Amino acid sequence: MTLWINGDWITGQGASRVKRNPVSGEVLWQGNDADAAQVEQACRAARAAFPRWARLSLAERQVVVERFAGLLERNKGELTAIIARETGKPRWEAATEVTAMINKIAISIKAYHVRTGEQRSEMPDGAASLRHRPHGVLAVFGPYNFPGHLPNGHIVPALLAGNTIIFKPSELTPWSGEAVMRLWQQAGLPPGVLNLVQGGRETGQALSALEDLDGLLFTGSANTGYQLHRQLSGQPEKILALEMGGNNPLIIDEVADIDAAVHLTIQSAFVTAGQRCTCARRLLLKSGAQGDAFLARLVAVSQRLTPGNWDDEPQPFIGGLISEQAAQQVVTAWQQLEAMGGRTLLAPRLLQSETSLLTPGIIEMTGVAGVPDEEVFGPLLRVWRYDSFEEAILMANNTRFGLSCGLVSPEREKFDQLLLEARAGIVNWNKPLTGAASTAPFGGIGASGNHRPSAWYAADYCAWPMASLESDSLTLPATLNPGLDFSDEVVR
């Protein structure tokens, strides 16, 4: 029984699904997808639970959410192992994900008050008030790269605001989704407030097509995000928050410490086996001897990165990709770039057949025409050389995406110029592209999102503002508008 609907664990009536460890092939989870009728059942449960949940005070909802945070802390080791085994990422990185989930609770509570709390300003004849109200029933689509943290960033603020939820984890991480749901169950959420439906494309399409849905919160690929946008077009009554991918540029200008710059680049391009939406996909490197030395050092250090299993000791920097198919797609993308005229500096290699252990790849594309503006979701870095900083900015902006952009340079003036001219929701200076702060917004523009960033701003799309003009008494104004006559004279 792998679906959680209206406070009960039930068996899915859709297709059967098996999840294996992407490196060892070990069977981790077996279950059945939710069919369309069960998706509708989850929606009815969420709709029925909404009025009571929304009428609770914030303090009452906060008690449940904080209880969930405590359960995360007490079950940190177990959840870390589940996420690591299912995604293929090393234990150390999965542990940081669970820590981020715990920290998200306090941050979301603070953001609720700052972004969507209540305000009141006195007026001569009364007061003006601002309040926020929950949308109602929201669907949350989770990604596979951070199956705990990223859905958590939607679910927690949505629950705090008073919404009820139907959560569909990625079909590639059903075990993690179920494990998190069982902690919410222990936290004491009332039946129907949070419902779990497992499944792939068919389940997702049934969920996004629900008429009685008030909104959809999505983190994932641009292709799926575009499909959801088309599906919900013409329905302005439904809130749609899209956080999608990127073809992110990292500009390496003058550097004083080559090893520090190489470290930042590896953290930007290859952490999580390149499976972060903010990962650097395009390295823009200044022409010249220093750039040559940097590139040689980057290749040398990257060549030593050997992916390993989640529990290998000593721990590897990167683990496997989410699946063998995902790893093979990266290899295919590299082969296509090479066929276009790219110069391979470091070839990506599958370490074993039928696993997802893939070494990083680096390929120079300077002067190659027609390079696709697409995100390769894995450890593959493309390199272009530039002559002037103005040229670098033009190259950085030459993409339909707009998620993250970074600059490595000692010159503050160049960063100020980049801040003015970059088309990206995240612009970093001497920091990895993959670094993020939950106290700041997280999201992009263009094909990377629809201007509804998550993290600190998630509270914004989880509630709508209600403005009120208020007075505790009603009296006739001393001065009336022209043409109004309230005298006792009889009009003849």
Curated annotation (Swiss-Prot):
Metabolic or biological pathway: Amino-acid degradation; L-arginine degradation via AST pathway; L-glutamate and succinate from L-arginine: step 4/5
InterPro entries: Ald_DH/histidinol_DH, Ald_DH_C, Ald_DH_CS_CYS, Ald_DH_CS_GLU, Ald_DH_N, Aldehyde_DH_dom, SuccinylGlu_semiald_DH_AstD
SUPFAM superfamilies cross-referenced by the UniProt entry: ALDH-like
Domain of life: Bacteria
Coiled coil spans: none
Annotated family: Belongs to the aldehyde dehydrogenase family. AstD subfamily.
Function: Catalyzes the NAD-dependent reduction of succinylglutamate semialdehyde into succinylglutamate.
Protein name: N-succinylglutamate 5-semialdehyde dehydrogenase
Gene source species: Escherichia coli (strain 55989 / EAEC)
Lineage: Bacteria, Pseudomonadati, Pseudomonadota, Gammaproteobacteria, Enterobacterales
